[in-house]
Amino acid sequence: MKKAVVLSAVALLSGVCAVADESVLIDFAKLNADIMADKSGGMTHNRRTVLDYASLADTSYTDEQKALMRSSLAVAQWEVVLNSSARNPVAHAASRVIEAPVSEGAKSFAGERVLGVRVLFPTWDSNANAMIKPAFVIPAYEVMAQVDDQGNVQAPTEEEKASGKGRFEDGYGVVKNVGVLKSIAVNTYGMNYPHGLYVMMRDQDGEVHRYFMGYLLFDSWKELVWNNPSYISDVRSREVRLYPVYPASTPHVVFEGFMVTRDAAHAGGDYVGYFKDVKIIYDKAVLSTVRDFADEDLWGIQARREAERKRVEVARFGQQQVLRYIEQEKLATEVGFTPSGGAQRQEEQQ
């Protein structure tokens, strides 16, 4: 039997068993928009997950443009990215993500707000897929901090720093201290579509892995489960390796998004679905994360790496937001033609 490689730093003691744990990777019910109202009065961003890239933008951006470089994991901020065989102007405009309220009388998740998505797949014979993803790459290391009603991230307090918790942990897209994945579960509402569903995750090395959860050919809520076929329960059959603890990243997983696939043999057109959460069961990479030294406070290596990643992200996300703003400003606001004088008189006569 092929031995599984365990990414851990555990002591090699006889009789030690793998310690499994369960965590919610992302819970869309926590991602409701609750701050920063738009012109119509609707909230636009999720307080806990606001990221402001303006502080890292260069001087070529105006203050107005920098104000656009703020985003969050609020459900309405998520995007649908179609592959080349599915991408066309009509499909691009129709495919979108919304914050969907579950009815009060529902048997599951009554009254909660979840992620709802519509994808317009091609109707001709063509393999196609759609990625449902956040507007930005979820950061693995973002110190816990408070956010005010205007979306300004406050400086973390000493207590928040000492907690060791990140802003994107506890159901907001990041789970740390993950060794070997044992199982993944997705709560989704199906409507008898024959499409396949994948969960995409990024590990501590920046590699993105996809896990096939099954087909969406069912009606109502269902928990789709992926079980690791290479998972070995007996630690004596495992190959254990020791890795440097710092400054290497603690093994973790970050949610990258969903992928919905449409086979050319199946009917195309609209797909509509709903997602509540993603959960994982995993072996801990390290039995205890309590250390004698505050390594990151002393050396700041991971913080510098994260800052560099953010600067790269600004080049993509910030410019994209500015271009979208410019396009919005150029949109025609007229709903019809201004009538000429003769046409006006003719309408009055009628």
UniProtKB/Swiss-Prot annotation:
Keyword Transferase found: no
Signal keyword on record: yes
InterPro entries: FlaA (IPR006714), FlaA_Spirochaetes (IPR016369)
Compartments (UniProt record): Periplasmic flagellum; Periplasm
Keywords, sorted A to Z: Bacterial flagellum, Periplasm, Signal
Biological process, per Gene Ontology: bacterial-type flagellum-dependent cell motility
GO cellular component: outer membrane-bounded periplasmic space; periplasmic flagellum
First and last residue of the signal peptide: 1-20
Coiled coil regions in record: none
Function: Component of the outer layer of the flagella.
Assembly: The flagellum consists of an outer layer composed of repeating units of FlaA around a core that contains several antigenically related polypeptides.
The name this protein goes by in its record: Flagellar filament outer layer protein
